[in-house]
Amino acid sequence: MKITYTGHAGLFIETQDCKILCDPWLHSNPAFFKSWYVYPPNEESVDWKMIEDEVTHLFVSHVHRDHFDESYLIGLFSERPDVQVILPDYKYADLEQRFIDIGAEEFLREGHHGNKVGETFLKTFVCETIDREREDSALLVIDNHQSFLNINDSKILPEHKEWIDTYLPSFQCGIDMMACQASGASYYPNSYNYDMLVKKEKCDLHRDRTIERFMKIKEELDVKKSIVTAGPPIILDEHMTHLNHYGDNASVFHDHWQVKEFDEDDS
């Protein structure tokens, strides 16, 4: 199994039977009123032509615009309508309909215990069904006794861990590698008029909780290697750079070196 990072939460997973593009998002297609984009730019650092020529499956974890890059996907399906969309068993059909609207024709729907593509096993976990915009999912890929769990922004619930503990031993492997974000994109509490000391305490608590979440998942699933994806974010507007993490200031964002160091054993 080979895994290539394409920026933000994007990954290209290659197995002996399939090649899966996960959450592709290009710097040239900013999201959220053009305020949020991949940095540094990933158009030149990633061989997109190779990926688009070879991809067999597409996995988009959820509908947020930093994961569902509509402009890119329209172009992909216009050239490769044969690419099969891995579709989690969502409560709502919004994601499937959005794919249909932009030209997707082939779907791989979640089976009772996952799906097999040749000898590669694929399993999705639906993690949130609070409302239509917050349905999220994770993808487990098992190939030749190697496994990769792409968690991205989602959560691993007790029933997901139970499934992994029950069925993974039959594949003669554990969770060899996971990809998961460890920062989040919240502007709270910086967007509130708190006293500076209170604001710093809340920022520190937020950062600690995101790190604890990452480490808890890693420890509970006994993950051997891990990749931090989708962040940490950074604000580039000059009048707002004080909201980034510098030393001991009040910021909800992690310093990039801090995130690297907390999981440095897996480098």
Model-flagged regions — what are they?
Residues L87-Q146:
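Metallo-beta-lactamase
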Residues D17-F59, E70-G75, I156-C173:
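Pre-active-site segment of Zn-dependent metallo-hydrolases
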Residues C18, E79-Q84, A104, D222-K225, ...:
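A short helix->loop->beta-strand "cap" motif at the edges of active sites that frequently abuts
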Residues D69-E79, D94-F99, E238-L243:
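Metal-dependent catalytic neighborhoods of phosphoester/phosphodiester hydrolases
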Residues N29, V63-F68, Y92-L95, N115-K116, ...:
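Active-site environment of divalent metal-dependent phosphoester hydrolases
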Residues I86, E159-D263:
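Cap/insert and terminal regions of metallo-dependent hydrolase folds
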Residues W25-P30, K34-S35, F125-N150, S154, ...:
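Active-site-proximal loop/helix segment associated with metal-binding centers of metalloenzymes
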Residues C18-I20, T56-H57, Q146-N150, D176-M177, ...:
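Structural motif
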